[in-house]
Amino acid sequence: MATIDIFEKCSEINDLLDKGLIEDARSGVIKLLHLTKGQVSPYEELVNHLIREVGLYPYIISENASWEDAFAYEAFKVNTGEKESQTLHLAQSEVLTALLKGESLAVSAPTSFGKSFVIDAFIAIKEPQNVVIIVPTIALADETRRRLFRKFSDKYKIITTTGANLAQKNILILPQERAFAFIDSFDEIDIFIVDEFYKASTTFERENDRANSLLTVMARFGAKAKQRYYLAPNIHNLEPNVFTEGMRFMRMDFKTVVTMSRNEYKKKEEGESQDDFVARRLPELLEELKSKTLVYAGSYNKIDQVSDLLIGKLGISQSQLLNDFADWLRKNYSKKFRLADLAERGVGVHNGSLHRSLAQIQIKLFEETKGGIDTILSTSSIIEGVNTQAENVILLSNTNGSRSMFDYFTYRNIIGRAGRMFRYFVGRVFLFVKPPDKADTQLNLDFPDEVALSLDTEQPGVEFNKDQKDLQRKYHAEMEQLIGEEHYNNLKVLPIVQAASPSLFKELVETIVENPDWPLNHVALLRNNTYDWREPLSEVIPIFAGNNTRNVQIAVWRLSNNWIYPTPLIIAGLEQSKVSVDDFFSLERSISFNLATILALINAIRLELVEGSVDLTPFISRVSSAFLPKLAYQLEEYGLPRMLSKQLSQAGLFDFEDDTKEITDIVSEFQQKGYASILAAIPNHHPFDEYVLKHFFEGISRIEKHI
């Protein structure tokens, strides 16, 4: 950018400041930084001054700063757990200051705001005893664990799985379904954090049960918390509600990057179908961009369609890393795995169904500046599952899954993935469909009857109205009449019951009271002969699987050998039954969560109500870890694929079948053995195994801090 142009831009920004248009001035500064990135300018001092005026202190070029600018850069530095203090921007500092004063906050801020810096700084400065962080997905739980582990694992036990024992100081990072297991473990917690708390509203969460369980967790943990800190993007107003009562709502419309959009849909030719338009223009656009790009496809079917298009249109990458990855996928999953064909073309997939380690590996490859994945095809999982940012976002669809057109709030969340502090000052958005009309987002956290029924009568954590009290009394009376007061009191305190929908719980209780032998021949689930499982599972699986019951049943028989047989053999067996490699992932997820949860609830009810009932916990434990050893399954969340765990087990390095160990015990064993010795113990390892193992070790490594 020419020197004279820089001066003119600075003058324009200064005029905006004089008029009090601070947000416009901030956007102008960010655009200027984008245009001058990597350039040496005689106007650095002037640019620094403007950066300071708009509160973007981390962007100050400290080497050549005036004393005023240098002072601001240093004054806003805080301890975030890194080796050196980091500079916050003005809005981050405002939020952190309020938290350090003991306030409870509900904060709405853009995706690029840097909310994690505030959490890290609070922990580093305040050193709370117990921190509970609720996140919407397991993928986000591991991403958060990796960040906090490297900073704070020397002082805190970082917990992301159920069954873990608490230490003196703990940081729990959990999706709400796992949080129920720990509610009664605390009399008090120092700070309770909910990321993406808008998902407690059924307006924004597709699954009502998930919204209800999040509200229940917010009520239960919120009552035990000295402080609460709830986070969401793009909320304009928070309606008064019992779940955020006593919290200050802070709407921080503070941009650290600028988003610029282009209406690609206007290039659609007359008479051209949308599919033909995408087929013509998308490959062209990706070739033009040649930089990190998220493609929002909206649904699984659309991802399949776009995958086939790109496989046919894009050339094979010259990257050895990507070619190794593609070969690794074919070897460890299936030669027919479409992701392998995409990977060798520099394309990845994020759909919320893949093995967690596999999703992590793709995000890691996407973060590579050279030789990695440049494009990720995604559903809405990319906006709720991870914090990945890109330079470009391409919007191919304006629907969320198979539903009708999404709203402006969802649209803003998707395009908010464009741009990243320090790397992409300007995020570019390419619209293949017309976006929704601009609208302010009002967040209303209703208090559903199902949530009222799930809360404790004496200590609900939130205030009930008269109708809710009457409803709860009626429900309790019905349950006590059905099974007796003692049985009901024993059941309702169990975490598995507290996490369940009250209506589902009641329905299962009624079924078992009417037929104490239900599900028929359930004791057969403890046998090794999978044929014997057919009768009891045929009665349980339809409860959650509906029309997909057949495929779930087939998957259970095949997956029962998950630890015994190689994954390609499991997938080949499923393909013989017309179940695809892509379905393999979603079915395994459904079995390990939905089937395990329903069976655990049935088992708890039977053990309480049916005298002499057989405990099905051994089978439920196997199902909940997809028939892998529990530790091997949990290590996948940490980024270690089952294929490597199996090889390490066969080499005699680890005993993953020792159920007395916690995941933290195994992690300690990995740390003690070290990367080099573990890699050396894997005979004939694949070149990409090294990349995967390094990524895993990065997630269990600490920062060496200066004393």
Feature names for model-found ranges:
Residues 1-707:
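N-terminal helicase ATP-binding lobe
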